[in-house]
Amino acid sequence: MALTTEEKKQVLSEYGLHETDTGSPEAQVAMLTKRIVDLTEHLKMHKHDHHSRRGLLLLVGRRRRLLKYVQKVDIARYRSLIERLGLRR
């Protein structure tokens, strides 16, 4: 369920601003997206896991707020990020 250290490093190297970046909005959104994808796959198999479903909704809300912040601060970074992550087709 949780991301392994290797998965985190891979996501952060791809979306972070530098190697040890964990706090930039892009890095945070990428980490949340990875967790959301994993949790969605879990819920496809375990349809009655309502506790995890609530956690998924909280993660989606947190990602939505971060994306709204990035959109407000720098629209070019926002557009680049959603294109790279494959969000909002």
UniProtKB/Swiss-Prot annotation:
- Output the superkingdom of the source species: Bacteria
Query: Where in the sequence does UniProt note compositional bias of the Basic and acidic residues kind?
Result: 1-21
GO cellular component entries: cytosolic small ribosomal subunit
* InterPro entries tied to this protein: Ribosomal_uS15, Ribosomal_uS15_bac-type, uS15_NS1_RNA-bd_sf
Molecular function in Gene Ontology: rRNA binding; structural constituent of ribosome
Q: Name one Pfam family in it.
A: Ribosomal_S15
Q: Mind listing the UniProt keywords for this protein, alphabetically?
A: Ribonucleoprotein, Ribosomal protein, RNA-binding, rRNA-binding
Instruction: Report any one BP term from Gene Ontology.
Output: translation
Which sequence ranges are marked TM in the entry?
Answer: none
Q: Where is this region: Disordered?
A: 1-24
Which family does this protein fall into?
Belongs to the universal ribosomal protein uS15 family.
Function comment: One of the primary rRNA binding proteins, it binds directly to 16S rRNA where it helps nucleate assembly of the platform of the 30S subunit by binding and bridging several RNA helices of the 16S rRNA. Forms an intersubunit bridge (bridge B4) with the 23S rRNA of the 50S subunit in the ribosome.
Q: Which NCBIfam families match?
A: S15_bact
**How would you summarize the oligomeric state and partners of this protein?**
Part of the 30S ribosomal subunit. Forms a bridge to the 50S subunit in the 70S ribosome, contacting the 23S rRNA.
HAMAP family assigned = Ribosomal_uS15_B
Against PANTHER family, the record matches this protein to:
RIBOSOMAL PROTEIN S15, BACTERIAL AND ORGANELLAR, SMALL RIBOSOMAL SUBUNIT PROTEIN US15M
Protein name, entry field: Small ribosomal subunit protein uS15
